[in-house]
Amino acid sequence: DENFNFSGQGSDKYSQQFDGNIKFKCFPNWPSEVSEKSEYVSLYPNVMLGIHIDHFYAFWLEPISNNQTKEHFELYYIGDESASSDEFKGIREKNFAFWQEVMNEDVTAIEGMQNGRNSPAYNGGNFSPVMDTPTLMFHKWVATNLTK
C-alpha cells in the first residue's frame, strides 16, 4: 500500500545471546512459541528498528552531504538489570559486537553500489522480486512524496 511509510521483514532464526549462564531478560508477554522470531521494520526515509525477545534496536541514517552519511545505532534492553548492571556488562558488549559485525557486513556492498551510481554506465540496478520488496516499497514512497 503506497500510503504506508514503512516496510520490513522478519526472521524465524533469532537465537538469544548467552554469556556463561547469563542471558538477557525477555519481554514478559512475548509468547514462548515465537521466541526465535524477530522483526526488522524500516520507517521511511531513514530509520530501521529491530525487535527480538530480549532486546531491540534503533538504527538511523543522517545524511551529511551528497556522498556522506552518518550512521547512528542504539540498543535497548528489557529491565534495568539487563540494561545497566555490571553482571550483564559482558553480554551487552558481546551483543553490541554481534550487531556491529552484522551491520558492517553490508558496508562494502553499499559503498560499492553508491560508487557505481556515479558511473555513466549505471542502469539503475536490478532488483529481486523476492528479496527487494522493501526497496521497491521505499522507491514508491519516494516517488509518491516527490510528486506531492
Feature-to-residue mapping (PLM):
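C-terminal catalytic domain of Rieske-type non-heme iron oxygenases
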Residues: 1-148
